Amino acid sequence: MPKIPTIIVAALSIPENLTSDDLFVHLWHILDGFLQRNLKIASYASDGSNVERKLQRLLENHAIRTRMVSIKHGSGFRDDIKIKIPFFGSQPIATLQDPKHLLKTFRNNLFSGARLLTFPNSVALFSQVHEMSQADDSPIYRRDVEKLDRQDDNAATRLFSGDTLKWLTTHRPQHLGLIVYLFVMGELIDAYESRSLLLLTRVQMVLRAHYFIELWERFLDISKYPAAKHYVSPQCADITRTLIHGFFQVLYIYRDHCSIRQPLFPWLLSTEVVEHVFGMCRQIVKDFTMLDFQFMVPKLFIRMREALFSTHISDGKARASGYNHTYADNRGLDIAALSSYPTDSEIAEASTRAYGEAESLFALLGVSAADIEAESSTLPSVRSWFYETSYEDDPENEDQPEEEQYDFQEVLECLEDSNPSTIMGDKLLRDFRYANIALSVDEQTTMYVLI
């Protein structure tokens, strides 16, 4: 609930090399202790790392039973959306991802030199955002784009804001791919972060993102665009699916499994509070040990209460400021809207509307959903642009270049997301980018030779 101070229940000192199986032992010990004491745990969130996502899957597999909920597909002819809710004892628990981390992941994928986000008649790429940042009336700062802090919450929020969309539609309406990408993904995060939207409106926003992503994946598959180059990273796609399904998991849990009607505050169901606690620890002792942490706990309780009841509002205009904690910001809070749960029929109607919106957005990008959904698509394959040759049969070219390049892109993305701050780290990242450009030029040269 808003204005309820955070309680630090447990802390454990662990090494950095623990696997998801190792962490599951600790997670289950804590969770089982809560359940045995009849404490109602509704959700478990993580920040999107590979280990933590696997840990969530291990937790779901440990459920004693599951409840399957179906949402009618908005197209009217595709399979229903299946939402699986795991139960531990009598308690259902949703698995969520941190929405602010996902917003930064969307931004980092857009800025990545390893991929080009491709839509039917448009693309979304870094240079478009860089051009916008140079304008005198730009809604974003140059520091948001040049030498950016990849963990800067404010920079990501500004990029996906309504002001940015307004500027683009006014000054760069030709950048349709970028406009639609920022709108759809930004609305998905707003479904979690808004303090006033009706729950039914949030349902429609989340489903719109689900259907748009579904159409996007289908388009790339039909057109034979390799997802490794023209779609968001596999990690980003997995986190997005978890966030979408997790929203409905927690919605059904609060609606159907709470003994009394409780308002749903989705922005509180994240890892933000944990990050805030660690940030405060570093303010007290910059490089603290486990012993330091134990002595800090009384101070942390006081500081958490001060932060919660303080009238200070975080500075949304700050640059390169890293994490921006807004979970205690209750401006515009509408508890009535957050307590009004939609019925199954209302969710089905919202699903139809959401599909219609996703369909319209894709038509705006140049291809109708009817063409994408057709059994035998008339969309031309990218491979059809080139003549058939015996190049693939040449034994000198059997060194699985696609797999090697895919691995190379994964390494480049990991380096970019790690935000290297040392001179050696910056040099390594620059060398990888140069190597990526060289590979791309070599590939293009090969294509021209074949033609």
Predicted regions and their residues:
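Non-catalytic regulatory appendages
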Residues: 4-5, 10-451
